[in-house]
A protein has these predicted regions:
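N-terminal, Lys/Arg-enriched amphipathic/low-complexity engagement segments
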Residues: 1-46
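Ferredoxin-like iron-sulfur electron-transfer modules
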Residues: 32-41, 359-380, 399-417
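Metal/cofactor-centered catalytic core regions of large enzymes
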Residues: 349-360
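Short, well-structured beta-strand-loop connectors
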Residues: 47-61, 79-80, 420
Length: 447
């Protein structure tokens, strides 16, 4: 087992962290697929409103690669298809039947898996709708099934606040996880399984499987950060990664012959009354998660996917294909009289401009930026927290000058989109958003 130490990064001291308690949610009335939240996919619908669907029925495919299909997370009928600007498909809503029907997929035993060719295995995963669980670095797109990756990284947990713990989703399912690992071993000769150095559960229960422990502040255990520290050459840049919880879905597909929809999600944040792990299903409504568990006063910001890497959603929306956390924090619209002159003992900040650096207890955070966007002052704060040694302030300026090649030389593609540069920037510049959009534009140019 190799230990990787990341010097840079930052851990925010935020309140509202979830407990280790696990609650099983009742079945929701509706679930949904959110094509808009799946990067680099141009959806082509295969259903229309009022069409009947089973769990595992095709709902849409990628126009660029029709082999890449996305399946229904519920059995019932298509209740609604919601569009955004320029007819972007935002949500495909499915009203569930009391007794859901399942599409049948082949059941594969461990003996069958041992003698199976890689090409056949890949085709079965794609037909089963789980190929999008794999993401390819550095753009985090769905990988090409015809390419053998230099490595597959299994990320068991995340140092980003409010992510599910391995002991919550792996408890009593170790055998299923081991079968999922055997599936991954057929896809690449180099399988890496990483966990945080402070995760005792994974290191004790999966001692024979964990290959790397990641030591350091957020985002030390991000697959991109791990690859940055261990890669030996540029040919490893296009490695794949998959989350530990998704490995269970692969195993369930082959073990049961049914499209798996189980999900363990986290509800947290200072405005959540019951902060805990919840066992539910893919595409669950956000208001189903928060029902009776949150202060619904209309002042909460619903953040899906984490406070750094997530996105704001309406409370009437649904959990996305990749997301497994819901955070409720105040909007922060209230104005503060002479806020600039106050010592800020309870204002979280990485700098020592406020006295909050003396406060070691967790602090409630809101969405107030406490200022507007202003010019970059070359303070270097963003470079001090960047885990992959980019100098974001200079990369940002090359992008503004439209010098994309120079930005690539600065290490733009190594950016793991952790959001720390945006968080610590005193000029309130959305550095992560700028870098992410630039990477996306560069990726689309290569197609």
């Amino acid at each position: 087992m190799m230990e990787i130490h990341t010097r840079k990064g930052y851990d925010i001291n935020i309140s509202g962290m979830p407990s280790h308690d696990i609650e099983i949610l009742e079945k929701p009335a509706r679930v949904a697929l959110l094509p808009e939240r799946i990067p680099f996919v141009k959806p082509r619908l295969k259903v229309k409103v009022d069409d009947p669907v089973k769990v595992g029925s095709p709902v849409f495919e990628d126009k660029r690669n029709p082999q890449l299909v996305f399946l229904s997370p519920g059995g019932g009928r298509i209740a609604d298809i919601k569009y955004g600007p320029r007819r972007v498909i935002k949500e495909v809503v499915i009203e569930l039947d009391p007794d859901e029907d399942f599409e049948a997929f082949p059941v594969i035993s461990e003996a069958d898996l041992d003698g199976m060719e890689r090409q056949k295995l890949v085709k079965m995963i794609m037909t089963g709708g789980l190929w999008p669980l794999f993401r390819e670095l550095p753009f985090r797109d769905v990988p090409n099934p015809d390419v053998v990756p230099p490595s597959v990284i299994v990320s068991l947990n995340s140092k980003e606040p409010f992510q599910p713990l391995p002991e919550a989703y792996l408890n009593d399912r170790i055998d299923l996880f081991e079968f999922g690992i055997k599936i991954l071993e057929k896809l690449s000769e180099n399988l890496l399984i990483s966990t945080s150095s402070d995760d005792g559960f994974a290191q004790n229960r999966l001692n024979g499987f964990v290959t790397h422990t990641c030591n350091g502040s957020y985002p030390a255990d991000d697959p991109g950060v791990l690859l940055y520290h261990i890669k030996k050459g540029p040919d490893e840049n296009r490695s794949w990664y998959i989350n530990g919880q998704d490995v269970l879905l692969l195993a369930m597909l082959f073990k049961t012959g049914k499209y798996p929809v189980d999900r363990t999600v986290v509800l947290g944040g200072s405005l959540a009354r019951e902060r805990k792990h919840l066992k539910t299903r893919m595409g669950v409504p956000l208001n189903h998660i928060t029902k009776g568990r949150a202060d619904d006063t209309g002042t909460a910001r619903y953040i899906v996917g984490g406070v750094f890497k997530g996105y704001t959603a309406s409370k009437d929306s649904y959990m996305g294909f990749y997301e497994s956390s819901l955070v409720l924090i105040p909007q922060g619209d209230e104005k503060e009289f002479f806020g600039f002159a106050r010592p800020g003992f309870n204002k979280p900040s990485r700098s020592r401009a406020f006295l909050s650096f003396l406060n070691k207890s967790s602090m409630a955070m809101d969405c107030n930026c406490h200022g507007e966007v202003r010019a970059c002052i070359n303070c270097g704060f963003c470079g001090e927290v960047c885990p992959v040694d980019i100098l974001p302030q200079f990369t940002y300026k090359t992008i503004l000058a439209d010098e994309i090649e120079e930005a690539l030389d600065h290490g733009l593609l190594d950016c793991v989109e952790c959001g720390l540069c945006t968080y610590v920037c005193p000029s309130k510049i959305e550095l992560k958003t700028i870098f992410k959009k630039t990477k996306k534009a560069y990726f689309l140019e290569q197609l």
